[in-house]
Amino acid sequence: MSEKRYILNVKTIQSSAFRVLVEALKEILTDANFEFDANGIKVMAMDSSHTVLVHLKLLAKNFEFYKLGREKITVGINMINLFKLIKTMDNNDTLSLFIEEDNESVLGIKLENIEKNTRTKYSLNLMDLHEDNIHCPPAEFESVITMPSVDFQKICRDMHNLADNIEIQSLGSQLVFRCSGDFASRETTIGEMSDGGMSFLKNDSPDDIVQGIFALKHLVLFSKCTNLCSNIELYLKNDYPLIIKYSVASLGDIKLCLAPRVET
């Protein structure tokens, strides 16, 4: 029997991070094109409402094994179906993704657990999706903030119980979250901390107010990425989308961009 030839074959031991990533992505993108090239894996896509932009980048050098049979391979995946296959994946499993040369319409998913001496293989039918040519011009942000991901998640969840929108404001050395609903309003102010709390990575104009109003329902979905990393980065600029950056363990990062709400 001849040895199988692969046009795609990648392997990682960071299976739990990959599972959390797919679980979060399926809430934002129903389907997505995963682009594989020599540098790694990339997803650049907008949600159906064209309010959210997802930019995922996982670096080839951070995988245990990464080999392509072509310069570039685009793989169309239904995120919900992918999650159904990997949601029971054990944290100690090694995850392999592969496409065989003679079966390019199917993504192979292999889960191996050395401790349990088990191997599970799935075959996921791929989709022929339209390729969006999304270009993001570089932007300079007045404020770049880092804060614990669990704190951001809690603020967004709690405020979503009161209101639909949240105002995020950077002023001086403080970060302010505000919301106003039908029966109550809330304001939470966070001061800079040098050890483990909120801090400014960049604060070009501390005397100026940098702020935006954003839909909480999207930020609550974003916060499903919380378990990926202990800290997030917020990129804030007046009259510009909010960018939230999560590290995907040590594989790479995902940036979620949310357009501001226009108050009428």
Q: Locations of the language-model features?
A:
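DNA polymerase sliding clamps and clamp-related checkpoint/processivity subunits
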Residues: 1-26, 31-161, 167-264
